Swiss-Prot record:
Belongs to the SFT2 family. GO terms for biological process: protein transport; vesicle-mediated transport. This is Vesicle transport protein SFT2C. It holds the Pfam family Got1. It comes from Mus musculus. It comes from the Eukaryota. The keyword Transport applies.
């Protein structure tokens, strides 16, 4: 009986000694099975900076904003252009009754101008706009002209309530936007104007040469 009791005690001691060693592989396997943060998105889906693991270094730039790709900038710029066209279209509906709805016309037109300018800023890129906002770059003439025309339009519509000045401010906004958008072209604004005027003159000369 003494030998049986001693063998039972030895068996229990061996079981207690081998229990932590057997538990460690289970914990290790469980930790290995857990995916990293952001891995559930898959390799084909965009991985945002806030879904990264703690071992990875933080991305360069602002932590509160995700990195915007070129395709996302194009989509956002196109959406801003569509909204700007919608605002311009609604403002055009108020053009026949401009004397009665001058304030709504100015607000819609100004909002369309702001959206069109935001589209141009998105297409240009965030670093360039950041340098402009920090004062590292001098604002262009089109930027200053647009800001002045926008402020004058809002002042004329909301404060002075002058129809003539509101219409002049809206025309100045359109001119500033066209000048800015032409300046964003790769070949420059002067070359684009020359090409447009050359095609216009060519079409006019051809129309004059054709018999009526």
């Amino acid at each position: 009986m003494a030998d049986l009791h001693r063998q039972l005690q030895d068996y229990l001691k061996q079981g207690k000694a081998s229990r932590p060693a057997a538990a460690e592989p289970l914990l290790g396997a469980k930790a290995a099975e857990e995916p990293e943060a952001g891995a559930w998105l898959g390799s084909r889906v965009l991985r945002w900076p806030w879904a990264q693991s703690a071992a990875e270094p933080p991305p360069a730039g602002l932590r509160c904003l995700p990195s915007v790709t070129r395709g996302q900038r194009l989509v956002a710029g196109g959406l801003c252009l569509l909204l700007a066209a919608l605002c311009f279209g609604l403002a055009a509906l108020y053009a026949p009754v401009l004397l009665l709805r001058a304030r709504k016309f100015a607000l819609l037109w100004s909002l369309g101008s702001v959206l069109a300018w935001a589209s141009a800023a998105l297409l240009r890129g965030g670093p360039a706009c950041g340098r402009l906002l920090r004062g590292e770059e001098t604002p262009s003439r089109s930027t200053l002209g647009y800001a002045a025309a926008l402020g004058a339009t809002l002042y004329a519509a909301l404060v002075l309530r002058s129809t003539v000045l509101t219409a002049l401010g809206a025309c100045a906004q359109v001119a500033a936007l066209l000048y800015a958008l032409i300046g964003l072209l790769p070949w420059g604004g002067v070359t684009a104007l020359r090409l447009a005027l050359g095609r216009l003159n060519r079409g006019t000369g051809l129309a004059n040469a054709l018999p009526v």
